[in-house]
From Swiss-Prot:
Protein name: Acetyl-coenzyme A carboxylase carboxyl transferase subunit alpha
SUPFAM superfamilies documented for this protein: ClpP/crotonase
GO BP terms in the entry: fatty acid biosynthetic process; malonyl-CoA biosynthetic process
NCBIfam families reported in the protein's UniProt record: accA (TIGR00513), AccA_sub (NF041504), PRK05724.1 (NF004344)
Domain CoA carboxyltransferase C-terminal: 35-296
Length: 319
């Protein structure tokens, strides 16, 4: 599988290309006099060292590119790798089934949970079918329907956030996009079951918040969370999307800054090079975080859960 190296990863890409070339030569002619295995091992070590060096000092714009990486694991990847017995549930029972949001019942270490998350799609046809992960009102109403079902059956709710934002089309506005988002914010704030939210890629504005109100909010190491994209901010403030790197730094969209502001609880570390380099390891780390969060929330009574969630929401912002 191609790793789809980003611009800032080009030195790594060049090393990996050399490794691939040597490996191919070795396969074609096993009678070569030189020790290719030794050279490949040396280059692999150099690649790991270079990756560590580059990823030790990433800027906000580089993190934003990683959050959008075409090979980055999506909601259904984590469902497959970290959960069992997933049964997808569809439709908002009012208009349609929005494929930009997926949801259903699964088991996390044997425990029934409700999973809800954005799904972007990989290939062109799937991207179009899932509207590039930008939900319409019916997507958020489907999410709310599943949350209410989880509450009735006393199941914890786990959400995965990965969207550039709610769909801004005319049809979505006509069908009540803002109302659907606002209703989700209100209803999620008073659900009587544990709610754990994790930003796994892009956390874009209200489109992310509509499934992002919870008792625990986590972010993967190279995910982002913001009220607008860096390009959108740059276009407004500097009249040019070329200023996106500057906007990304100014907006504080990365996990360490958001944890510093107490907008999130935990940062889930990613494998070296990002989640797309080792989805299985990433899923294992995420699963461990979810289990730890559930164990913590299980200690609370319903009243304590709701009071703590309320206090959390009221603490947002500056005095």
């Amino acid at each position: 599988m191609s790793l789809n190296f980003l611009d800032f990863e080009q030195p790594i890409a060049e090393l990996e290309a050399k490794i691939d070339s040597l490996t191919a030569v070795s396969r074609q002619d096993e009678k070569l006099d030189i020790n290719i295995d030794e050279e490949v091992h040396r280059l692999r070590e150099k690649s790991v060292e270079l990756t560590r060096k580059i990823f030790a000092d990433l800027g906000a714009w580089q993190v934003a590119q990683l959050a959008r990486h075409p090979r980055r694991p999506y909601t259904l990847d984590y469902v497959r790798l970290a959960f069992d017995e997933f049964d997808e549930l569809a439709g908002d029972r009012a208009y349609a089934d929005d494929k930009a949001i997926v949801g259903g019942i699964a088991r996390l270490d044997g425990r029934p949970v409700m999973i809800i998350g954005h799904q972007k799609g990989r290939e062109t046809k799937e991207k179009i079918r899932r509207n590039f992960g930008m939900p319409a009102p019916e997507g958020y109403r489907k999410a709310l329907r599943l949350m209410e079902m989880a509450e009735r059956f006393k199941m914890p709710i786990i959400t995965f956030i990965d969207t550039p934002g709610a769909y801004p089309g005319v049809g979505a506005e006509e069908r009540g996009q803002s109302e659907a988002i606002a209703r989700n914010l209100r209803e999620m704030s008073r659900l009587s079951v544990p709610v754990i939210c994790t930003v796994i890629g892009e956390g874009g504005s209200g489109g992310a918040l509509a499934i992002g109100v919870g008792d625990k909010v986590n972010m993967l190491q190279y995910s982002t969370y913001s009220v607008i994209s860096p390009e959108g901010c740059a276009s407004i403030l500097w009249k040019s999307a070329d200023k996106a790197p500057l906007a990304a730094e100014a907006m504080g969209i990365v996990a360490p800054r958001l944890k510093e502001l107490k907008l999130i609880d935990s940062i889930v570390q990613e494998p070296l090079g990002g989640a797309h380099r080792n989805p299985e390891a990433m899923a294992a780390s995420l699963k461990a975080q979810l289990l730890a969060d559930l164990a913590d929330l299980d200690l609370l009574s319903e009243e304590e859960l709701l009071n703590r969630r309320y206090q959390r929401l009221m603490s947002y912002g500056y005095a």
